[in-house]
């Protein structure tokens, strides 16, 4: 085990919409009755059970990765439950960690609740040659634009497909990732893309395939309407990618002036920025040259761990 860390399995129902909820209920019960000093909840939904270990005298920390009740994939009942988790965290948590300044402002303005800003971190990766991706998808270095993430509406993938279809380029668009209780939406995306053979859906990727996709892209795009702290954006920059992101604060505050930014939800602006990037290799290379050093220094995992442990011990 890494520094004494052990994994403990809990009971859960592997059913759509119930897996996370039942896991958090089981985990909270185990934490309440176990010999633990600190219980750390992640995401708003699981925080609905934070009161239980708190009732048993545990120090409780909540990390809010994003405002999950705003995500389009959730119905009214699920959104209500997630909102209950948010309010439980506000009322019961000893400390709340947020991953973006936007979410920090939300908690201050909505509840008057102070939070601690501790973003995600990233490590510098090993860059792999395009071997598996060439074999499976016919991809070469710098001949594709990459989106990598869950296929959910708020990620803006529909904008990206619509914009890319109007771009004059031989480069491909690779949509990498699986659905997240959103199979119908994933099918809609594939229907949108079916008349453009430049668009490739890889499905869920991990390991060497993931590394090769990150390490050989011409551009990485994250056109989201809503984010918490986009770890995929940190990872993409750590691989030395030129990134093209929407101007929401959660993306813009990460990239600062080290990436290309377009107006959120604006397909025409996204198309224009894509076309400019495809036509201007020197501009793209400039962003590539700066990305990895910038992001690995700004978001260092050792610093993240140190600050989190300080909250545990407070």
Regions found by a protein language model. Give the residues of each.
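Membrane-proximal helix-turn-helix segments that form the acceptor-binding/catalytic region
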Residues: 29-32, 55, 79-96
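Nucleotide-activated donor-binding/catalytic signature segment of Leloir-type glycosyltransferases, i.e.
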Residues: 186-205
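Short alpha-helical donor nucleotide-sugar binding micro-motif in glycosyltransferases
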Residues: 204-205, 212-217
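Short hydrophobic beta-strand element within catalytic cores of glycosyltransferases
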Residues: 242-245
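Short His-centered aromatic/hydrophobic patch
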Residues: 41-46
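Aromatic "clamp/platform" in nucleotide-sugar-dependent glycosyltransferases that forms part
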Residues: 225
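A conserved mid-protein helix/loop that constitutes part of the nucleotide-sugar donor-binding site
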Residues: 143, 147, 152-166, 187
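Conserved acidic donor-binding segment of nucleotide-sugar-dependent glycosyltransferases
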Residues: 260-268, 276-282
């Amino acid at each position: 085990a890494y520094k004494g860390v052990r994994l403990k399995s809990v009971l859960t129902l592997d059913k759509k919409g119930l897996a996370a909820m039942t896991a958090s209920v089981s985990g909270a019960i185990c934490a309440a009755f176990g010999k633990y000093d600190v219980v750390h909840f992640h995401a708003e939904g699981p925080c609905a059970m934070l009161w239980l270990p708190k009732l048993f005298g545990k120090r409780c920390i909540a990390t809010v990765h994003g405002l999950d009740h705003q995500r389009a994939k959730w119905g009214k009942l699920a959104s209500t439950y997630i909102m209950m988790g948010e309010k439980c965290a506000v009322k019961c948590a000893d400390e709340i960690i947020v991953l973006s300044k936007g979410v920090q402002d939300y908690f201050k303005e909505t509840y008057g609740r102070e939070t601690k800003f501790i973003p995600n971190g990233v490590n510098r990766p090993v860059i792999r040659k395009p071997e598996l991706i060439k074999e499976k998808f016919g991809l070469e270095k710098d001949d594709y634009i990459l989106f990598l993430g869950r296929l959910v509406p708020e990620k803006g993938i529909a904008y990206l497909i619509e914009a890319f279809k109007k771009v004059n380029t031989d480069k491909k668009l690779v949509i990498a990732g699986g659905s997240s209780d959103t199979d119908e939406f994933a099918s809609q995306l594939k229907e949108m893309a079916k008349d453009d053979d430049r668009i490739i859906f890889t499905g869920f990727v991990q390991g060497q395939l993931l590394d090769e996709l990150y390490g050989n892209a011409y551009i990485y795009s994250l056109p989201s309407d809503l984010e918490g702290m986009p770890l995929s954006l940190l990872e993409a920059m750590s691989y030395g990618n030129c990134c093209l992101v929407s101007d929401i604060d959660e993306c813009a505050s990460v990239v600062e002036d080290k990436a290309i930014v377009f107006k959120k939800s604006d397909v025409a602006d996204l198309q224009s920025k894509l076309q400019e990037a495809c036509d201007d290799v020197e501009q793209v290379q400039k962003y590539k040259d700066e990305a990895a050093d910038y992001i690995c220094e700004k978001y260092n995992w050792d610093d993240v761990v140190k600050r989190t442990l300080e909250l545990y011990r407070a």
